[in-house]
């Protein structure tokens, strides 16, 4: 509880998802990792390997998931819970909603780059988690998420390859100052 008070999340919520694995293990997915006093994970960082199925699991390849749960909240207030079930035996135990991605797309734009970490799609996650090797080119039309995917890739690489990249920094290049303020 003391550590939670020290986190500077602003209006962002700590947890946005949960994965229930087929071995009765659950992981809460959030913007950063939080452990209890015994150093047991309470929340796993979205960049951690165990969080990958939250973004990539499909009906064809559930990646060991029984359920993927999305939380919609504002600060510490929980507004909505939605389940995606991968095990039909769990069908009566879920919360059905109109889709975390659709809800995010329905929000008004305010001139600021949106925090997409809760709604990253499988194809975007493949780019974000692509192994660290040479150059990676991402192409797409305007508004398709290239910039946010690139920024999340930088965050992922700095998390995953902290020691080899430590002290090297990240350079973000943009076409003008307005764009750089936007991101």
Q: Language model features by range: what are they?
A:
Residues 103-183:
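P-loop NTPase Walker
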């Amino acid at each position: 509880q003391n550590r939670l008070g020290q986190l500077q999340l602003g209006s962002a919520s700590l947890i946005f998802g949960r994965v229930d694995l087929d071995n009765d293990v659950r992981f809460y997915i959030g913007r950063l990792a939080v452990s209890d006093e015994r150093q047991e994970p309470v929340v796993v960082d979205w960049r951690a390997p165990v969080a990958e199925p939250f973004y990539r699991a499909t009906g064809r390849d559930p990646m060991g998931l029984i359920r993927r749960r999305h939380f919609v909240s504002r600060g510490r207030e929980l507004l909505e819970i939605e389940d995606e079930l991968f095990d039909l035996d769990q069908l009566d135990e879920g919360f059905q909603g109109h889709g975390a991605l659709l809800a995010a797309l329905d929000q008004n734009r305010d001139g600021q780059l949106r925090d997409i970490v809760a709604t990253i799609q499988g194809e975007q996650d493949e780019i974000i988690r692509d192994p660290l090797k040479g150059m990676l080119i991402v192409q797409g039309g305007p508004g398709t998420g290239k910039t946010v995917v690139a920024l999340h890739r930088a965050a992922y690489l700095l998390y995953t390859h902290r020691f080899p990249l430590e002290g090297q920094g990240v350079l973000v290049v943009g076409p003008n100052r307005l764009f750089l303020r936007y991101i």
